[in-house]
Amino acid sequence: MKNSGISWTDHTFNPWMGCSWRSPACDNCYAATLAKRRYGIAWGPDKPRHRTSEATWKQPLAWNRAIEESGGPNERVFCISMGDIFDAEVEGGWRDEVFELINKTRRLNWLLLTKRAREAVEYAKKIVWPDNAWIGVSVEDQAHAYRAEIIKAIPAPVRFLSMEPLLEPVKVKLDGIDWVIAGGESGENYRFLPKAWVLDIQSQCREANVPFFFKQWSSFTSDALGHELNGEVCHAFPTPKNRKAALDTEVVAAK
């Protein structure tokens, strides 16, 4: 059963909380504000990351078991909304434990979204990449479109881009990319998202035959302006690919 308020996933799993600024998409980080307000946790490069409870860590096992018992389709898990899975300041063993959990929950498709593309590739070099782990990067502006190129080295069944908040027009090379999510920013200091920018991303996806998911417009509250684009709900999802488990060293060498 879906337990996440994020429209492109079924579940959200946070093995820890805490992060630090990485790029302009982080400027109005909702997670940092929520962590401080609700849990008294301060974020930053010199701040500790806080591991969540054992009960939280057991949730994916329960979700996986429920799917096995019901015989339903695989469900998506976003990991993590309150930090970054490839944050270098996270205790190394915690990340290893997450990947052990991924391998134990074969009925879950794990959406690993990061702003640390190079760190993701470095970690991928050390492991056999799970075939139920999707890899995604944030691409909020043209200066960070390079992240999309870096993750093409990882043999994930789905490689995706999160272009939310979309801060300017962006041109991306979508070969080797399987899914694009785009959207505007919400909250008190949201940055305006022009419709033309979204339509351009949608057009690039159509030309490349890449599924496009439009999440929301920019507004004070996330649902104030809805999520229709020209009267249409654009909620397309990707079909996972059967990619080889080894890292693409040619792509790595080119970065």
Where in the sequence are the language-model features?
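Conserved AdoMet/S-adenosylmethionine-binding subsite of the radical SAM
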Residues: 56-211, 223
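N-terminal [4Fe-4S]-dependent radical SAM core
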Residues: 1-76, 84
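Small/flexible residues
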Residues: 40, 51-53, 117-118, 149, ...
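A very general structural signal that marks isolated residues within well-ordered alpha-helical segments
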Residues: 32-35, 118, 157, 218
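General N-terminal targeting signals
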Residues: 30, 94-96, 152, 229, ...
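Auxiliary Fe-S-binding modules of radical SAM enzymes
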Residues: 1-17, 38-41, 167, 171-255
